[in-house]
């Protein structure tokens, strides 16, 4: 194994080597750079690592530049140590040998450096040396001048063939000296540059020498990093005039030859006579110029202009100074003007601010005055309340005054919230004095009067608090709604659930009807659905028409204007109970008419017809069939009166004649239904067409047969027959006699009687005609009755299919335990309703800001607060009150 090679690899892996900077030459040439990879080796060969880092520190110190023109950076490449030029045509073999020697030397140096670094690392590990380069200054012996000087510019020039001396280009015949840049004084014109450009054609040698001299003189100054300020020269105008006058005469003699040579070149003339300086190429242009401005000048000004014309550089510095002074004065004037404007603007702004402050002070005074007045009124009202001298009317006037006189303060300070301190104590006193359980049968109208007065007063408060909203947690609730919820709703619920009797609806119905305009819709619906409907459901299920002394219509129909469609779900149960009660009913009993007449306009026509067809019409037709028709001993036909009183065709005379018989029949009937006597017996429940059909089928067919047999008998007495005929005809009202079928029957009987009077025999044709008539009546009646019955039954079935029983909005209606209806809570009612309809009802993990529990009713978040249900409306993100039916419809219609 090569231990040295392994050590080198381990050393290279652990060594954190400092890389050289990535130069612009590397970016341009990349790997193809000639010096790429060798630069670092050359650096390492020339200096150690400590020297390298120490030299790096010197870059923060001021730099001493080398004078240009003396140092040639690439001169060491072109000369040997003895000063002889290197031949470019040496052999390649010698160069290869030199390179091999250099590589060997480099490898040895690298090994020595690695050994030194290993020793240093061991020392650091022993003594726990930290970061930082602690080098000695003894190694820094070499000067910076030994380094090759030159940046990327020199490298690029060398690539393009520049060798350090001579001109640019491959052959050295290019440009040697670039264009010189000469400094022009600040704010000086072009005329001042002409003298600087006189010596522009001097040789480059002189310039190089001068530059070398200046550079050599200023080396020490530049190394120090600062320059001394040159002394400022003061300009004397008188001395300048004297010097210019003496020098002009000298120049005229010396420059005559020069003017002849330079006559072809244009002479620049500056005309300063006008308000603005003008440039001309010569005096001729001034003479022939069209626009001359003649001005009268003083002698001093004329002398100055003559001097300026003679001189090539006429007082440019003085001119410049005067212009500067003018500009400075203009700037001072503008600054002063701006300051004056700024101060004026400040004054205006301050005056406006003072006015605004005065207005705010006045407004604050007015507000303070209003607030003090409001406080005085509130304190006086509180004193009156404490002394029990305050009434609802007086308090209403105070609130109305506050709202009308101080509308902004009423809304900003939320003065309507004073109802908790002022209004609620008065309302509690009124509610304690109000006894809802007082019965109207005892002639005690005090509670009714109190309720009416209180409802009228609360209507006023409702209008006053219509736009007043109180914030409770996350949602906003109307103030009037809070009053009714907290004070009146518990009072009404307690009365309706515990004290109110269902079969005495006058108190509760009048209570809710009088308070319908006062109570909010949500509270009214909550009372009807949660307190009234459950008790009505229980009472309807317990109601028996045969034993209950109070009819159902007396205590159920008063709720129709308030409940409306909610009672429709009870109608099928009511019809079934009536049909079951009428199974043992006899047509002589009037109670059936009194029971069914109030439901005539409430039940639908199809359902009412089906009830009559199932319970009433068959028994009436049977009673007509059982009617005895005996000419020898004819009794009064009471059965026909039983039939006719189901319509509005009953004759009052017949009713009066048969009252005694009806009473006797009712007394003999054990299964009579008890009713009140306030309903008219001419109910009109059965139509005229059905009554005529019953008479044709069950009465007139038998009546014609008996009349025909009586006329055939030899002992027939025509007077008795005519009296018998007229007696039967009087039993029917005009509406029945005027019917075509009934007319034809009476006409046939008259024809037969006429034949007997004329001593004509009744032939077989007459008998056949009567039998055909009877058969046709029987057939038509049977068909009509069957069609009628089928239509009624079909309509009844369709009604039951089209109108399914709606789920009652109150869960207690669907619950089996109806006896505990007063003790059931709203939460239990909602839970039972959800179970009945297969909906989800669970408590949520979330709660409101006030700590109320949120429940999920089929994906609808609800809150149950004091027997009120509130749901979260997604449209406005508020908690709004809702009834159970609304939640059911919303969840089932999804």
Swiss-Prot record:
Record-level Gene Ontology MF annotations: nucleic acid binding
The keyword Nucleus appears for this protein: yes
Region of interest (Disordered), ranges: 71-149, 187-225, 785-821
Alphabetically ordered keywords of this record: Coiled coil, Cytoplasm, mRNA processing, mRNA splicing, Nucleus, Spliceosome
Location (main, coarse): cytoplasm
Basic residues composition bias: residue spans: 97-126
Acidic residues bias: start-end ranges: 202-217
Quaternary structure annotation from Swiss-Prot or TrEMBL: Identified in the spliceosome C complex.
Task of the protein: May be involved in pre-mRNA splicing.
This protein's name: Septin and tuftelin-interacting protein 1 homolog
Organism: Dictyostelium discoideum
High-level lineage: Eukaryota, Amoebozoa, Evosea, Eumycetozoa, Dictyostelia
Gene transcribed to yield this protein: stip-1
